[in-house]
Amino acid sequence: MSFTVTKTAPALITPSEPTPSGHILPLSFFDRLPFLRVFLVDMIMVYGRGDQPAKVIKEAVAKALVHYYPLAGRLTTDTDDGELSVACTGEGVWFVEATADCRMEDVNYLQVEPLMIPKEQMLPSHPEGVDPYTLPLMIQVTQFRCGGFAFATRANHAVFDGIGAGQIKVAIGEMARGLKHPTVKPVWCRDVIRKPIPSQISATEPHDTDLSPVSDIKFTNNQTNIECCSFDLSLDHINHLKDRFAKEVGKICSVFDVITAKLWQSRTRAIGLQPQTEVSLTFLLNIRQVVLHNELPPDGGYYGNCLVPLVNKAPSGQIANAPLFEIVRLIKEAKDDLLRKDSASLIGGMPPYKKPSYADLSIVDWRRLGLYEADFGWGGPMFLVPLNEHTVTSCSTYLFKSPVASKKDVCLVTYCIVKEHLEAFRAEMNDFT
């Protein structure tokens, strides 16, 4: 059965009050990294109910843009230094209203991969002749027959990261609920994160993340042979392992550390690479308090890119055969080591983007980005639906909150296994579900 989404023509939402305009705001060194400036992040947030959500959200966006006025501007390189910057033009954010001719349950709450409604119908569009890479943010609100709605965004990663996205969407929700000002005041200060001077970077800092070629499995980078699967992980079991780790190792680890260790080991065992083949695990760390500690107020507010990738590498045989707590320790120590570095080393140590192989795995923790707190007046989202990150990193996994409020499980969604390894991967992960 096919379903149809009917869209209105895109319309510009401008700030509801006058905002600073006619000047250029610089972006940070992180913001200007090549793989971020051309990365349009597509995402859907699924809500169970809402009364005229498009109208409410449209008005809230206009109010939020007073505080987040750079989002109403345009990305440009027409500057004195030729660097990517934001021109504060006040033009506004493109907004699309849409209706779907079905209920959310008819399309499984947009949780099936591929989507039962083509993602192009769910995502905001822009008028012909407009360059999407100049737009910080576009929004579409789609109302379903059941009363639920989807809040979809397309955002240029050069302007904000995942934590920034959460902060912005929470602010829109606060405006929708009648607040006059966002609880967290937005902070720009992009010029603090400057391009590092080579002499400031530690000589031991890694700058090349190339892995040895993986020749013992065929892997294409077009996602056609990658299977999507999900697991509901028991928090009771994970907390039990955390307690055991604390007793045996004498240190405290997080839920993320335990899940990530189990995931890395399970996948490494399932894909069966040669023991000497190097495998990698990459995840993001928030370094706001390290590089911006003198600039940020106590409640934060910086919404630019400040999540850095931490790449963990080890021989396949070591990860497959080590006790789980040893892998937890490796992950925890890598995190602690990175956060002990000084600001210059953190900024200068950003690894260049490399095309990944099947030996590489990445994980993103969507529970901690603030997105679940984006409440437009009818509660937070039931589901988050990232639509394109796994096409960039290839072997990706995501941690979500359980959509059932009474459950304390963590939902793990993976795009990291080819079909021939799926059964073995599920078997390895089963004792965590």
UniProtKB/Swiss-Prot annotation:
The active site is at 157 (proton acceptor), 375 (proton acceptor). It catalyses: myricetin 3-O-[beta-D-glucosyl-(1->2)-alpha-L-rhamnoside] + (E)-caffeoyl-CoA = myricetin 3-O-[(6-O-(E)-caffeoyl-beta-D-glucosyl)-(1->2)-alpha-L-rhamnoside] + CoA. Pathway: Flavonoid metabolism. It is an enzyme of class 2 (transferase). Its EC number is 2.3.1.-. It comes from the Eukaryota. The keyword Acyltransferase applies. It holds the Pfam family Transferase. This is Myricetin 3-O-glucosyl 1,2-rhamnoside 6'-O-caffeoyltransferase AT1. It comes from Crocosmia x crocosmiiflora (Montbretia).
